[in-house]
Amino acid sequence: MNASGSAPLGANSEVGQLRAVLLHRPGDELKRLTPRNNDQLLFDGLPWVDRAQEEHDAFADLLRSRGVEVLLLSDLLAETLGASGAARIQGIGAAVDPRKLGHTLAQELAAHLRGVPAPELSTILTAGMTFDELPVAANTASLVRRMHHGGDFVIDPLPNLLFTRDSSFWIGPRVAITSLALPARVRETSLTDIIYAHHPRFRGARRAYESHTAPVEGGDVLLLAPGVVAVGVGERTTPAGAEALARSVFEDELAHTVLVVPIAQARASMHLDTVCTMVDHDAVVMYPIIQDTLSAFTIHREDNGVSIRGADPFLSAAAEAMGIGKLRVIDTGLDNVTAEREQWDDGNNTLALAPGVVVAYERNVETNARLEASGIEVLRIAGSELGSGRGGPRCMSCPVARDPL
C-alpha cells in the first residue's frame, strides 16, 4: 500500500493478485440502443438494462468480496469534471463535433455544456444527447438542427464503455491510452484520458503509450509474464498499431519481448482475449479450433533497434519468451459444437484475480468444468444481458493495480 492506503498502480502480468480495477456500470447509454442502431453501436441485441445492471453489480460485489477495490468510471469522470476546468474543456471538445453539427450549433451546445453540473455532464458524455434534448430552440439559425429528426444523436452514446479493458491498460507502473478502431468507440479514449490525466487518484501516473492513429485495443493485449507482451492483430488492432506499441514499450523498458499474434478478422474473435486468456502463471484457456494454427511473430528489443522472427506456433513462442518449458492449455467446451458456442459466449474471456483464480460467466458450463478439473478456482457470474455486447469478465475490467509476479 502507498501513503494514501491504496495499492500501488500498475501490473506486470495477467494473473498477479488483483488489488484495484476500473469498471463501468451500465447506464443510460444502453437505453439508447434500438433495432435500428445496435449493429452500428456494436451490440448483437438489445440488453435488458435493469438486469444488466444487476448482473454488473453482482460482478462488482464479487470482486469486492475478494478484496479488490472497484473504481467506477462514471464516478471518477464526474469527480474529475467537477474538480478540473481543463478536464471539462477536454471532454466537451471531444464530444461536440463541428463537422457533424455545423459551427452555429456546435458553439451553442458547447456553451451550454460548460455550465452543466459535473454529474449531469458526465452522464451526457457517456449516454449521449439527442436533438430533442438540446437546450437550443428548434428555430435557431442552424440548418443541421432543422433537418435532423428529434431522435437523432447530437452526441453519440457510448454503450461499449462497459468494456473498460479496451480504452486503456496498465503495463508495469505506466498506463497506456489506446486508439480504438471503430467510429462507435473512438471517443471512449477521451474519457479515460481525462480521468488518468486529471483525477487525483492517478496524479503522477506516467504514460506507456500515447494514443496513436494506428489502432491498438486493450482486449488484444495480454501481459503473459513480466517483460513479455502478446498483441493480437485482427479485426481491431492493426499491424501498424502492434508495431508502434512494441517500439513504445521497448523504449520505456517495459518489455523485452512482444509477440504479435494474427487472429481471424471476425466478430467472434474481435480481440485476442476472445480466444485465449491467462488463468495461471503457466496456463491459458484457449479456443481449441485455433490452437494448432495460432502463430506469433516474436519481436525482441536489440541494442540497435528490434529483431523480428517468425511466424512460429504461438504456444511454443510464448513458452520460450516466458522462460518456461510449456504452457498448460485448457480447452474451451467439450466438443467442437460446444466449444464454438461457449467461445461465442466468452468462455475464453476470464478475469484472473490471482494465480489459478478466475471470474467467468456461469453459462459456459463445460469450459468452467474443464478449468476446475485443471485446478483452477472458477468464480461464476451471470451474464445473460452483459454478454450482448460480446464481452466477458476480462473485457469488462481494466486492472489498475496487481501484485507483481
Swiss-Prot record:
GO BP term, example: arginine catabolic process to ornithine
UniProt protein name: Arginine deiminase
GO cellular component terms, semicolon-separated: cytoplasm
Reactions listed under catalytic activity: L-arginine + H2O = L-citrulline + NH4(+)
A Pfam family: ADI
InterPro entries associated with the record: Arg_deiminase
Domain of life: Bacteria
